[in-house]
Curated annotation (Swiss-Prot):
Pfam family, one: Methyltransf_9
GO term, biological process aspect, one: tRNA wobble uridine modification
Protein name (record): tRNA U34 carboxymethyltransferase
Catalytic activity, reaction form: carboxy-S-adenosyl-L-methionine + 5-hydroxyuridine(34) in tRNA = 5-carboxymethoxyuridine(34) in tRNA + S-adenosyl-L-homocysteine + H(+)
Gene3D superfamilies, per database record: Vaccinia Virus protein VP39
Family: Belongs to the class I-like SAM-binding methyltransferase superfamily. CmoB family.
């Protein structure tokens, strides 16, 4: 059983304590009502995995845990089997005591693009919206964050996060809650808020930007990473039924349009930090994610287009500040 009591105790003593007015009831309702049919199987993998304390832990350059002496073949096989029970692994990679989880996405590449543009994370309290399996939470801790909180309603991601946490010595500096942004009150408590790979899934993108703003302290920093198209500040792609085989893609603005949206929502010092095309080296099928990936979503005769004929995915990073 995945419990959240440690997180409640942690925030009871800090500036997030007012979250306890709503959070425990929301989590209790989730535990009663909303569990996926495979959740028991996934949570068993978490329960059966041994808690391990790394002899060497690197969260600054990667997410890597090592033991002082190599694990036995039996120990490695047990860890490998339990981790594979939580497939597909989409965001990573992780290197855990000799088991290398080669995830669909090279999320470390995204982090390398984002990190140089951020305010120093040392001592910061951070919220990562749509955090997936929590890979970037650990990298935020590695960059000096005091506390990194991720929210993502996908229950497989919660189990993946908790299993990694056990292998990192039950580290309590990062936490993942199975919630969506719409379930959070206006906490106004985070120094930095990340939203990476979420905006294009929102039916109302400007409402999402307001929700992110409501989580920031005054002078707090927003890090927004999302799909974009080429064009001026009035360019927005509204895909039909699917975009790159994804059904739930609603609005893909140009980077200048997205900058304008952020300014319309009251953010200041908005800047476009990075724009790059997503490659099939960054997102691809692996032995830890064996179904279709980006190569299957692009036109085989013209890799600059999706199978639906839209521009192939490119992603932008924008940085903004709440006044």
């Amino acid at each position: 059983m995945i419990e959240f009591g440690n997180f409640y105790q942690l925030i009871a003593k800090n500036h997030l304590s007012h979250w306890l007015e709503t959070l425990p009831a929301q989590i209790a309702a989730w535990q009663r009502e909303q569990q996926h049919g495979l959740f028991k199987q996934w949570s068993n993998a978490v329960e059966f995995l041994p808690e391990m304390t790394p002899w060497r832990l690197d969260l600054l350059h990667s997410v890597t845990a090592e033991s002082e002496t190599p694990l036995s073949e039996g120990q490695l096989k047990r860890i490998d089997t339990l981790l594979r029970n939580l497939m597909p692994w989409r965001k990573g990679p992780f290197s855990l005591y000799g088991v290398d989880i080669d995830t669909e996405w090279r999320s470390d590449w995204k982090w390398d693009r984002v990190l140089p543009h951020l305010s120093d994370l040392t001592g910061r309290t951070i919220l990562d919206v749509g955090c997936g399996s929590g890979y970037h939470l650990w990298r935020m801790i590695g960059a000096g964050a005091h506390l990194a909180v991720g929210i993502d309603p996908t229950q497989l991601f919660l189990c993946q996060f908790e299993v990694v946490r056990k292998l990192l010595g039950n580290d309590q500096r990062a936490h993942l809650l199975p919630l969506g942004i719409e379930q959070l009150p206006a906490l106004k408590a985070f120094d930095t808020v990340f939203s990476m790979g979420v905006l294009y899934h929102r039916r109302s993108p400007l409402e999402h930007l307001w929700q992110l703003k409501d989580q920031l302290v005054n002078e707090g920093e927003l890090v927004l990473e999302t799909l974009v198209v080429d064009g001026d500040e009035n360019t927005v792609l509204v895909p039909g039924d699917r975009y790159a085989q994804m059904r739930n893609v609603y609005f893909i603005p140009s980077a200048p349009a997205l900058k304008k949206w952020l300014e319309k929502c009251g953010f200041i010092d908005v800047r476009i930090a990075d724009v790059c095309v997503t490659t099939t080296e960054e997102q691809r099928r692996t032995e830890w994610m064996v179904t279709e990936s980006l190569a299957d979503f692009l036109d085989p005769n013209d890799r600059s287009k999706t199978v639906e004929g839209y521009p192939a995915p490119q992603r932008a990073v924008l940085i903004a500040r709440k006044p």
